[in-house]
């Protein structure tokens, strides 16, 4: 579920923290992907026919997650991303009640799905079939095997995948976290990417403006979130707990706006509980906000030294066996995917241009003078002003001394010219003086300015991806 209403609140209150980017902007970047969320989306999105059933092999086992993961990963690599897939470990104990609620919702959805099938209501079948989806342990293991054979790094988190993704950005081992769960921000991810799966699909899944706009993603920058909301990280965590998270109940009657105002006034949940009207706002009897806070601050994750990230060569023959023999994929289609995979690996090895250059700036004389004047005005005490004045006096004296030397040289040269005595004295003197004046006053330097022409490079990548209509994660979908 993530944090209730967080993305909308950030968009309204700290709009500079959210921006749309093209997938090309992530070229050369390492992105940590919430694998469980991705598999869930693939199973929902890839359907066989109008009955919205999953793709299956001859044994009747679902293969939608394999097809989606393989296709999507190659597509991301073709766009220059370097994906790392992070899988969930054991769920935290605090999440037990939330998981029970999800189980109840899933059971209710299954009942509604059965009814919809009896009535032949295709729209309701599609809606309820999505709510009944859950990623099984076997599907997770198959996904890990597929990625390993493709040479893609796989990380198994001891607990929450989005928490591990967030810490990979803290370790500077990844640029961003890709997930639909906004609680990755509460875990401290530097950058959150949303809609990554929805926007790396086949050409059929692009909107009508996609040819001009490209694949559009949503990027949320945590630093800008805190700056825009004017909150510390600790205050932001408490704010998110009050909005509603997976780890504890929240105070009834408090939404995101009220929670924000209370945090701004009282700074933390402890002070809020002491000061609010508890007749108006009902505090849960067993309000485990302290435990929830600690789960966000100190989640169970692998330490940096425990994380191993290796992009390996694909195991082509084993990959063919896994897809064709074990899961009955079409051989021609598999060959096509492998060809694209090998080609895409070359794209991911390209370095970003900003890794080749560093910015070097040289201050102009005008800027130096302005800064000196400001420094003089800001100098505190007569001592600092006197010191600046002394420095200025020394500079002026040095300039004066230089001018005297130049004048002496000029005088000596003039005397030399005057002492010449030949029949063309006057003419020679005038010529020498003209040359002298030209050298002294009319010296010019010609420089050419260069223009760098930015050219847009367009690359059309054809693919045979399965059409994937990825839904955005909403509160009514059981994630």
From Swiss-Prot:
GO cellular component: mitochondrion; nucleolus; nucleoplasm
Cofactor(s) in the UniProt record: Mg(2+)
Identification of the protein by name: Flap endonuclease 1
UniProt-annotated binding residues for Mg(2+) 2: 181, 183, 246
Binding positions for Mg(2+) 1 per the UniProt entry: 34, 88, 160, 162
Main location: nucleus
Reported function: Structure-specific nuclease with 5'-flap endonuclease and 5'-3' exonuclease activities involved in DNA replication and repair. During DNA replication, cleaves the 5'-overhanging flap structure that is generated by displacement synthesis when DNA polymerase encounters the 5'-end of a downstream Okazaki fragment. It enters the flap from the 5'-end and then tracks to cleave the flap base, leaving a nick for ligation. Also involved in the long patch base excision repair (LP-BER) pathway, by cleaving within the apurinic/apyrimidinic (AP) site-terminated flap.
């Amino acid at each position: 579920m993530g944090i209730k209403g967080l993305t909308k609140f950030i968009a309204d209150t700290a709009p500079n923290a959210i921006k749309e980017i093209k997938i090309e902007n992530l070229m050369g970047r390492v992105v940590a992907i919430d694998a469980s969320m991705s598999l869930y989306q693939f199973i929902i999105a890839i359907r066989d026919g109008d009955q919205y059933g999953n793709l299956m092999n001859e044994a009747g086992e679902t293969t939608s997650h394999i097809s989606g993961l393989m296709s999507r990963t190659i597509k991301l690599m073709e766009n220059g991303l370097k994906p790392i897939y992070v899988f969930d470990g054991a769920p935290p104990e605090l999440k037990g009640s939330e998981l029970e609620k999800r189980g109840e919702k899933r059971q209710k959805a299954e009942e509604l799905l059965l009814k919809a099938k009896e009535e032949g209501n295709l729209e309701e079948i599609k809606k309820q079939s999505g709510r009944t989806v859950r990623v099984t342990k076997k599907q997770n293991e198959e996904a890990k095997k597929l990625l390993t054979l493709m040479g893609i790094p796989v990380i198994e988190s001891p607990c929450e995948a989005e928490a591990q993704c967030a810490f990979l950005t803290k370790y500077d081992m990844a640029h961003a976290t890709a997930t639909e769960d906004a609680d990755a921000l509460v875990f401290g991810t530097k950058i959150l990417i949303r809609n990554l799966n929805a926007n790396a699909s086949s050409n059929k899944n692009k909107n009508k403006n996609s040819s001009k706009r490209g694949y559009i993603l949503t990027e949320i920058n945590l630093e800008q979130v805190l700056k825009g909301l004017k909150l510390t990280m600790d205050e932001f965590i408490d704010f998110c707990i009050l909005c509603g998270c997976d780890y504890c109940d929240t105070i009834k009657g408090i939404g995101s706006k009220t929670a924000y105002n209370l945090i701004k006034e009282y700074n933390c949940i402890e002070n809020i509980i002491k000061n609010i009207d508890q007749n108006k706002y009902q505090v849960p009897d067993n309000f485990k906000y302290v435990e929830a806070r600690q789960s966000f601050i100190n989640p169970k994750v692998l330490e940096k030294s425990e994380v191993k990230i290796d992009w390996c060569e694909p195991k082509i023959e084993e990959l063919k066996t896994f897809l064709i023999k074990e899961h009955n994929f079409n051989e021609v289609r598999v060959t096509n995917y492998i060809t694209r995979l090998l080609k895409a690996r070359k794209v991911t090895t390209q370095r970003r241009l900003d890794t080749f250059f560093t910015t070097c700036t040289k201050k102009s004389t005008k800027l130096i003078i302005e800064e000196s004047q400001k420094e003089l005005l800001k100098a505190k005490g007569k001592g600092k002003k006197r010191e600046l004045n002394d420095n200025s006096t020394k500079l002026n004296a040095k300039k004066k001394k230089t001018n005297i030397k130049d004048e002496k040289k000029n005088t000596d040269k003039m005397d030399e010219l005057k002492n010449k005595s030949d029949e063309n004295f006057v003419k020679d003197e005038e010529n020498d003086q003209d040359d002298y004046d030209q050298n002294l006053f009319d010296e010019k330097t010609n420089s050419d300015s260069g223009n760098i022409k930015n050219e847009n490079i367009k690359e059309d990548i054809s693919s045979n991806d399965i059409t994937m209509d990825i839904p955005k994660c909403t509160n009514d979908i059981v994630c």
